[in-house]
Amino acid sequence: EVNASIAGRYYQIGAIRAVTERFESKRREALLVMATGTGKTRTATALVDVMQKAKWAKRILFLVDRRALRDQALSAYKEHLNEPLVYPREGDREFPLDRRVYVQTYHTMLGVVQKQKQYVSPFFFDLIIADEAHRSLFHVFKEIIDYFDALKLGLTATPKDKVHASSYALFNCDKGMPTYEYPYEQAVGDGFLNDFEVLKVR
């Protein structure tokens, strides 16, 4: 059951259910398309909570493309999951093997895969969540995704018709058919986002 205090909006719950149903049907990859500002990180955090409680996933890797997003995600996991076993935390110098939630930039994790394969098994993670999957993955970081034998979830705010075909292929979705979509127009219509106008300044 989804913890509504983490992600209680109807579309967040719908996204989590769509992903878990896909995993239950033995599909090992999923892709969420959610507009910026609709709570992708909260949705991912609530999904981790569901999967850990159901014992579907013990160790989770959350990939981001910038350190600022890494820090934001770390704060979310610590706050909403009361999770002390996260990586990185202050004082960490090496890649530890005793944590439950790992939050890393793609570049840092690529270094781990390339240089520390003897320490990190392909079966180490049970779930990998890739944030901003549209731009950060296919060419440069596909090596990370291919190395680990885990359930995989891509997150992106890019409208589904703008997501590159390679991203759909990476998460085993037909082009234009993400696992779940909550677009900008729907978020505005629901009152969760404010519409905007582009003004030309002369």
Predicted regions and their residues:
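Conserved helicase motor
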Residues: 67-68, 88-95, 106-111
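ATP-dependent helicase/translocase motor core
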Residues: 1-59, 68, 72-83, 97-101, ...
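A short acidic, often aromatic-flanked loop/helix-cap motif at beta-alpha or helix-coil junctions
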Residues: 92-97, 186-190
